[in-house]
Amino acid sequence: METTKKLFALLCLFVTMNQAISVSDPDDMETFCMKSSRNTTSNTTYNKNLNTLLSTLSNQSSFANYYNLTTGLASDTVHGMFLCTGDVNRTTCNACVKNATIEIAKNCTNHREAIIYNVDCMVRYSDKFFLTTLETNPSYWWSSNDLIPKSFGKFGQRLSDKMGEVIVRSSLLSSSFTPYYLMDTTRFDNLYDLESIVQCTPDLDPRNCTTCLKLALQELTECCGNQVWAFIYTPNCMVSFDTYNSSLPPLPPPSRSGSFSHRGNNKLLGGMVLAVSVSVFAFLSLV
């Protein structure tokens, strides 16, 4: 009987923790609804323009991995964009943007500015013109809970050096089919490869793209430089790295099963998954 009670409590613990770390389910999306002195209501012209804009973004994601537009006039003007990562196909891009537009509309009701991140895409809208302007907040990162093996030596420095090279090369790709997107794979150990990916929104000039990527890389290496993989999004760029054993079959893309955190408001989620794991282990030891 006592064991049954403990198992029931454990089940409740799992449910509670799952709710605690859930962020904009169902698609692992993180939404930022910006505070504003001029919030809106559901029946305003601005909101109608916003709904039109989000619908257009969703539709256009079937044809491109980046799109921006402006709709409305004067104080009812809405600016918006989406960006899909350069390694996803049209079907994945469309699915991500479609879900993101639904989530951002649901989570940021009556907000005049918002942004939503997912590992495959981001969607943004605002009543202020933001294209061509470099912004670094809010940022959001995911990372593995697994640490780099000690046998890798000074991995953090090697990671910074390699990512720095990739950033310089990506700044030369402003006119490519997928502007500023670059993926590089380098053997850095007898068995392990380092995969580096960077990308900027195409509206940035090369100088601002480089600045955005360098700042994102700095934040990523500070938080996650010893992790097996990590990924960061900012409003204008993304940086990711992954290490894997090239002699083994490829693993599926990283999901948000590791730690995650963001910068730009008062919320902080980093390390929660690790805390969950420790708590569950401690509880199991009592059963």
Curated annotation (Swiss-Prot):
Residues 287 are cytoplasmic. The chain crosses the membrane at residues 268-286. It is a single-pass type I membrane protein. It comes from the Eukaryota. Pfam families: Stress-antifung. It is found in: Membrane. PANTHER family: CYSTEINE-RICH REPEAT SECRETORY PROTEIN (PTHR32099), CYSTEINE-RICH REPEAT SECRETORY PROTEIN 57-RELATED (PTHR32099:SF85). Belongs to the cysteine-rich repeat secretory protein family. This is Cysteine-rich repeat secretory protein 58.
